[in-house]
């Protein structure tokens, strides 16, 4: 496949931090693969902007989680999508890449595809876990799906959607053997007792719902395991300010509150208490025992429960096809239960060794040079639509 030297235009939309990570990885591959001076623009975050991406809107405008919570933001989100659609139809890009955010991207992709613009979607929605009816939207909206997990292309191809397994960029980024000692030195935690990383979420609403419960669990853990130390990474300065009162309300805790540096915090840990999400995959790639938890508003939880197919929500369990780490969700996420489960993960050396083997196999399966594979797939789609 050979492109002429004419620069291309690729529009991309990412709606949350995990999409920003994927988008930055893809952009790195596209810069290497497509002609120089090609233009990349749309909606993205700071990681994408750092690799020559022109963000017309910040992704924070789209980063709303949950059914009930999203209602008040719908008018602005629809306005942004409508304006972006008009721009892209008026000046069609050579390809559009929607990165996750299916509720935003599928409607946009369907309109663009109908106008003859090639559409690629990066991250297959978890149709194998819940809301399987979305496959009908995928068929209408997507020319090609870039899949993070190896079992997804077969499911899509049965429905008539072209797909490529590209692996996960975190598996490329994270070393197979994490440097726990080096991470502790970086955080100022070189000696002393065991370390537990606590990650209550990357959104204000998540921290407000589960943060107090996590900190109460930390208090119980310190009572039951004297000498234990905690590190709590905050994704942004605003979230650090939100977490600080929880730290102040528990003065007896030995806790280090950081800004950013979530991967360093998890690398430094002996065990992790984590709110469900992509970060659980990161914890698995770091070979760490963990407890996965979440709390969402009651109505959101009821909707999610009724539309789910699998008995687990954490990516490590989904990829393993069984429970390999505990999940404590909704009303089961009490301080006592979280403390007990996390300390069990901390203390069980046989379980730690077994998890290391399981997570190493996952790591190797997902380590595929994602940036290059994804960029090659995008290039093939663009090339297939060029006049011969």
Curated annotation (Swiss-Prot):
GO molecular function: lipid-A-disaccharide synthase activity; phospholipid binding
Catalysed transformations (reactions): a lipid X + a UDP-2-N,3-O-bis[(3R)-3-hydroxyacyl]-alpha-D-glucosamine = a lipid A disaccharide + UDP + H(+)
Keywords: Glycosyltransferase, Lipid A biosynthesis, Lipid biosynthesis, Lipid metabolism, Transferase
Enzyme Commission number(s): 2.4.1.182
Pfam families assigned to the protein according to its UniProt record, in alphabetical order: LpxB
Record-level GO cellular component terms: membrane
Pathway assigned in UniProt: Bacterial outer membrane biogenesis; LPS lipid A biosynthesis
Name of the top EC class for this enzyme: transferase
InterPro entries xref list: Glyco_trans_19
Single GO BP term: lipid A biosynthetic process
Functional description taken from the UniProt entry: Condensation of UDP-2,3-diacylglucosamine and 2,3-diacylglucosamine-1-phosphate to form lipid A disaccharide, a precursor of lipid A, a phosphorylated glycolipid that anchors the lipopolysaccharide to the outer membrane of the cell.
NCBIfam families: lpxB
Family: Belongs to the LpxB family.
Name of this protein: Lipid-A-disaccharide synthase
């Amino acid at each position: 496949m050979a492109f002429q030297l004419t620069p291309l235009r690729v529009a991309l939309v990412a709606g949350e931090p995990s999409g920003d990570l994927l988008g930055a990885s893809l952009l790195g591959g596209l810069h290497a693969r497509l002609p120089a001076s090609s233009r990349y623009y749309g909606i993205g975050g700071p990681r994408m902007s750092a690799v020559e991406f022109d963000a017309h809107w910040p992704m924070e405008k789209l980063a709303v989680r949950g059914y009930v919570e999203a209602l008040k933001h719908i008018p602005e989100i629809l306005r942004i999508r409508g304006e972006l659609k008009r721009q892209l139809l008026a000046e069609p890009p050579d390809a559009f890449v929607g990165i996750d955010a299916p509720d935003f991207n599928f409607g946009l992709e369907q309109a663009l595809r109908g106008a003859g613009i090639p559409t690629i979607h990066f991250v297959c929605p978890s149709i194998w876990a819940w809301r399987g009816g979305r496959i009908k939207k995928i068929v209408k909206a997507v020319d090609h799906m870039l899949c993070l997990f190896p079992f997804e292309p077969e499911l899509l191809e049965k429905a008539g959607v072209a797909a490529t397994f590209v692996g996960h960029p975190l598996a490329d980024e994270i070393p197979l053997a994490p440097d726990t000692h080096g991470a502790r030195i970086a955080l100022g935690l070189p000696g002393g007792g065991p370390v537990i990383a606590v990650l209550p979420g990357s959104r204000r609403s998540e921290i407000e719902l589960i943060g107090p419960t996590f900190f109460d669990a930390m208090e119980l853990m310190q009572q039951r395991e004297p000498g234990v130390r905690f590190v709590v990474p905050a994704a942004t300065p605003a979230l650090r300010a939100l977490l600080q009162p929880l730290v102040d309300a528990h003065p007896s805790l030995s806790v280090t509150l950081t800004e950013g540096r979530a991967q360093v915090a998890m690398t430094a840990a002996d065990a992790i208490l984590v709110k469900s999400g992509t970060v659980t995959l990161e914890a698995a790639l770091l070979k760490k025992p963990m407890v996965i938890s979440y709390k969402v508003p009651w109505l959101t939880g009821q909707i999610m429960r009724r539309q789910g197919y699998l008995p687990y929500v954490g990516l490590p369990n989904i990829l393993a096809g069984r429970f390999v780490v505990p999940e404590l969700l909704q009303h089961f996420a009490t301080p006592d239960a979280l403390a007990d489960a996390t300390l069990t993960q901390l203390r069980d050396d046989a379980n730690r060794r077994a998890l290391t083997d399981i997570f190493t196999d996952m790591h190797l399966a997902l380590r595929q040079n994602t940036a290059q594979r994804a960029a090659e797939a995008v290039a093939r789609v663009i090339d297939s639509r060029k006049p011969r």
